[in-house]
Every structure is written in structure tokens, then in C-alpha cells.
Amino acid sequence: MAQFDLIVIGSGPGGYVAAIRGAQLGLQTALIEKDGGLGGTCLWRGCIPAKTWLESAHRYEQMASLSEFGIANVDTSKMKADLSAIVARKGKIVIKNAKGIDFLMKKNKVTILKGFGKLIGSGRVEVKGETTEIHSAKKIILATGSVPRELPGLETDGQQVLNSDHILDLTNLPSHLVILGGGAIGVEFASTFARLGSKVSLIELADRLLPIEDEAISVELSKIFTRSYKIDCKVKTKITSVEKKKGSIVCQLSGACNDRLEASHLLIAAGRSPVTSKIGLESTRAKVEKGYVQVNDVMLTAEEGLYAIGDIVNTPWLAHVASDEGIVAAEHAAQSLGKSIEPHPINYTRVPSCVYCDPEVSSIGLTEKNAKDQGYQVAVGQFPFMPMAKANILGEAHGFIKIVSDTKYGEILGIHIIGPKATELIASSVALMGGEFTVQTLMHTMYPHPTLNEVFPEAARAVHKQSINM
């Protein structure tokens, strides 16, 4: 048995960051991982592979407009998507990033323990790999992540009925892909495969796509999906049964649409489930409600010295949230062991969210409805990318930015973007919200020309109906 100051179970973006931060603060740290490589779902089966697919789809789509950019004599009529090459490139990027995490562990002198980690009480962890070992630690951080949610009657088989893990290794282009779930995962894969040439039907139980985003964003995304990519979006609809045939599947719909859809593949993108079973929580005083481990503002559970972060706690399921939670947990653990450090709990009202479909979507803060529900007197400013020179240069003059503000003080309550590079533009919004900028301050902030960022002061001016370029 080895004794550590800190053991982290799970090496995703929450776990590996927590391990590094603990080691930086002088804690003898171990990181437990059950899979073959470090990085967790985000690196191997989630964020990174999915965005690699999206980039391939974006490049493929751009080829069709080469002549508009003055690139002549290129015959794109014979162009086709090579999914095997996309999968191969995805694999190279994943391996490269995994090696980077391996290097960081060595650099920070973090001990790697290979196997399935399980709490067995009294600060001890069983690690079951090629052999079974038991190690102990003064502090333990759980970062066990999540898995694709299985729906009764719609079980995946990895062939025709897929989850978000399976589809990342698909080497044959679906002729017709039905996607159940219009959240971030669903719209990203809809955008990917529609651009690569698949017919796509997108099924969402809620009354709109991306139901947690501002309603104006959802409406715009549906319009662009339907108009530009011919994606068949069906909301207020669910799949009640699936019949498998040779070479196809038949989905029975109910709700606003009662059609039968025959397709080549079905992707289940209806969320994920936290991994909180079989990890030994019953041997602790930690509380679990509806599958989530309950924690305080420094990620500490009801069990002394036991922390939980990432997808197993009821906070936004985002890699960057997990990473920051890992830092908070590691710093509190170090502080409680006598290190001179002050942890900074996360302000969850200022978490940026990104969806990497085309057009991209990003947001931070309150939606217009949320703000009104919380009692604010709301003023909204919305400005399109269409008049922006840089958007037209890129050939992507679609979408808009929307600012939600409070009329009393001019405080910016939320910023919502749909359009080119939205997931990069949101970084400015994080700074604006963090600095508690007012609409008036933003109106008088100078942005360079020509850039996409010019939409920010224009949207601020739109709050007072004073936009210059519209």
C-alpha cells in the first residue's frame, strides 16, 4: 500500500487538472485511470474527436465555394467525404493530446495508477487493473465523469443504432441519419453529417432546438439548419419505437409529428448519465441525489476529505467547468493540509457555453426569459453579422449577437451569439461579464476594424436603438 496526500480518480479535464494543481502545491499526488490513455471522455470520445469531425465537415463545405474566392479550375463535382481519413486524423489528434497529458504528469511528478478506482472507506482506494492494489490518501477527488444515456426500447448496437461514442468511428457515410436529441451533441452531429452529404432528421422533445439557450438563438439556428442544410427539424416530438430491417431502421414518431421515418442510422444524443455507481460511494457519508454527488462551494462532499467534480456533480456539464472545479478542489485540499493557498469558488452565473455546430452558438449569463423571470427590467440589443465587413470577407454573414441588460443600471446580464467564430468571440463576453461592464461602457469601447468583434459595441448601441451600421 502506498500513502499519498491526494488521490484523484479519473483523468478527464477535471481529474488531470486537479492532479497537476495538487502536485504544484506540494502534495504527493496519484491519478487513477481505468482506460488505456489519460484524458477521459473529453479527449477520447467527446469534445476533441467531435470537433475534429466538425472541422473536416467545415473544410468539405468550403470546397464548394472555391470559385467565389477566385480559385478556378478545381473540379469539386467528384469530391466525396472519406470518413476513414476523418477517423484517422481524429485518432492522430487524440494521441498527440494524450501524450501531452502524459508529459504533464511526468513533469509534475504525478504517480499514474492504471485500473478501476473504487472507494473502500477510511481514505483508501482499491485499484483493480492487471493486479489489485490498495492505496490510501489524506484527500481524494472523484472525477469519474459520465457515459451516454441509454433509453429503454432504444438500446444502441453500435451498427445502426448509435450513441455519441460509436458515431465518432463511423467509416461509412449514413444515407439518412436520424438524430434523437436537439441539444449540443445532437445539433453538432446534425451539422457535421448534413455538410458531409447525409440526409439528416433531427428530433427534439422540447419545443425548440438548444432549449437551454436564448429562444432567439434557437429560432435562428432552426431557420439556418432548414434553409441552408435541408435538415428536417421536428420539435415536440419523440421516438416511441425502432424497427430494424436489413440495411435500414424505421423510427415511429409521436407528439407534434406522428410520421414513420425510415433511415440508415439512428443516433441517440439524448444526454449523458453521471458515473456514480460501483465507485464505492456507499462506503462513505457522501450524499447522492438523482445520480449526482452533493458538494459545497469548494467541491467537498459530506465525507471528510472527499471531493467530487465534473459530470458527477449537478453543475454545468462542460469540460472547462470540470477543470476549474478540479483546481478549486485541489486548492482546498492543499489548504486543509497546511499549504498557503486560498481557493476561489466558481461563480456559476458566469460560465461560458459553446456549441460547435455551423453556425456556431455561444452564450454566457442570463437569457432574456431568465432575466425577466428573476425580476429584472430588461432591455435587449441585437445586431446581425450581415453588415460586418469581416463576416462578408469570410463568406459567413449570418447570425447575430444579442445582449440582455438591466434597464436600471445598464448592467449586462447575458450575451448570446450565433454566427461565425461564435465560440471564439465568447471570450470577450467572459471578460465583459467578469468586469461587470455596463451597456454604456461597452458602447464607448473601441474595437478594431475589420473584425467580427465589432458586433459587440453595435449590439450595445442597439439596446438604445443607436446602432451605427444598421
What role is predicted for each listed range?
Residues 7-9, 117, 135-145, 179-180, ...:
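Short hydrophobic core segments
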Residues 114, 295-297, 406-407:
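Short, acidic, Ser/Thr-enriched surface-loop or helix-capping motifs
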Residues 47, 144-199, 203, 233, ...:
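Glycine-rich dinucleotide-binding loop and its adjacent helix/turn
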Residues 14-21, 161, 185-189, 195, ...:
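Short glycine/serine/threonine-rich phosphate/pyrophosphate-binding segments
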Residues 7-35, 48, 53-59, 351, ...:
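Flexible, glycine-rich terminal cap/loop adjacent to redox cofactors
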Residues 2-4, 20-27, 33-173, 206-210, ...:
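Glycine-rich flavin
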Residues 157-174, 260-340:
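FAD-site-proximal beta/loop scaffold in flavoenzymes
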Residues 1-12, 173-183:
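Beta1/beta-strand and adjacent pyrophosphate-binding region of the FAD-binding site
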